[in-house]
A protein has these predicted regions:
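Beta-propeller and closely related beta-pinwheel folds
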Residues: 13-36, 151-159
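Active-site-adjacent structural elements in folded domains
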Residues: 24-28, 36, 79, 109-113, ...
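A structural feature that tracks compact, well-ordered secondary-structure segments
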Residues: 8-9, 31-34, 39-63, 69-71, ...
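Hydrophobic core positions in small helical hairpin nucleic-acid-binding modules
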Residues: 22, 99-103, 219
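Generic long, charged, amphipathic alpha-helical segments
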Residues: 149-172
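Single conserved hydrophobic/aromatic residue that forms the stacking wall/gate
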Residues: 1-7, 12
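Intrinsically disordered, low-complexity acidic Ser/Thr-rich regulatory segments
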Residues: 108-127
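Internal, charge-rich low-complexity segments
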Residues: 76-109
Length: 224
C-alpha cells in the first residue's frame, strides 16, 4: 500500500506517531518527498515496476491511514523500493524515437537531433541491483506512465543467475554507489564506468562477484 500525506501532517512530537496503518504481514519499505508534478516509481523483488503520477495518490486527512494500492503483486512478490521521477508528457512515439536516436549516437548527446536535446538534458536513470551482484541500468524514459494499482511492467529479467531484486534507485551516470553483502564485503564503483545503459527488459551485468552462498543485501548512492 502507498500513502500520500501533506507536509503539515508531518509535525511529529518526540514520542512519535503512527505514520501508516499496516496490515498483517506488511511492512514499510521507504518514505520519499514528492511534489505535485512528480511521478512515483515502485519496484518489486521479482523484477516488476510501475510508474504513476503523484496526482493519482489521494491526500489523506491524517496519519494512521492504511493508504491505497500502488502495484498489484503476484503471490510470491513484494515491493522493495520506491523513488520519485520527473513527470513527463512525451508520447510513446517521441520516446521511442529519442531512445533509438540516442542508441545510434552511442550516448553522445552532441550528436542527437536538436529536437531531442531537452529530453537528453532532463533524462534520469534507474539502477536495479540483484542479490547475486548484478546491476541493470536503464533510462527512466523506458518506463511509461500508467495508472496506479496495475501489475506493472518488467523492470529487470530475473533468473537464477542474477537472483531477485534487492533495490532499484534513481542515479546519475557519474554517481558512485556502494554495495554490501551478507558476509560484510563492500564494493564501491562508478555507475557510468561499470554499468552500461540497456533496455528495460534485460538481466543486467555482473557488478559484484559473490561467493556461492553470498548475497548482496544493500546498495546506496554515495554523496560527493
Amino acid at each position: 500500500m502507498i500513502l500520500g500525506l501533506v507536509g503539515s501532517e508531518m509535525c511529529i512530537r518526540d514520542r512519535g506517531k503512527t505514520a501508516i496503518k499496516l496490515k498483517t504481514g506488511d511492512r514499510l519499505i521507504g518514505v520519499i518527498s514528492v511534489i505535485e508534478n512528480d511521478d512515483v516509481q515502485l519496484a518489486t523483488t521479482n523484477g516488476k515496476s510501475i510508474r504513476f503520477a503523484t496526482k493519482d495518490l489521494r491526500e489523506f486527512s491524517g496519519l494512521g491511514s492504511a493508504g491505497v494500492r500502488g502495484i498489484k503483486l503476484a503471490k510470491d512478490d513484494k515491493v522493495v523500493s520506491v523513488c520519485s521521477l520527473l513527470h513527463n508528457k512525451i508520447s510513446i512515439d517521441v520516446r521511442e524515437s529519442y531512445l533509438k536516436a540516442k542508441n545510434e549516437a552511442k550516448k553522445d548527446i552532441s550528436k542527437i537531433n536538436n529536437k531531442f536535446k531537452e529530453l537528453a538534458n532532463t533524462e534520469e536513470y534507474l539502477l536495479s541491483i540483484t542479490e547475486n551482484g548484478y546491476g541493470k541500468l536503464s533510462s527512466a524514459y523506458e518506463y511509461r506512465i500508467t495508472n496506479r494499482g496495475g501489475s506493472g511492467v518488467t523492470n529487470i529479467t530475473v533468473t537464477p543467475k542474477n537472483g531477485r531484486v534487492i533495490q532499484s534507485l534513481k542515479v546519475n551516470l557519474d554517481d558512485n554507489i556502494a554495495l554490501i553483502s551478507d558476509t560484510g564485503k563492500l564494493l564501491r564503483c562508478n555507475v557510468g564506468d561499470n554499468i552500461r545503459v540497456v533496455g528495460r527488459v534485460s538481466q543486467g551485468v555482473s557488478v559484484f562477484k559473490v561467493d556461492a552462498n553470498e548475497k548482496i543485501v544493500s546498495v546506496a548512492r554515495l554523496e560527493d
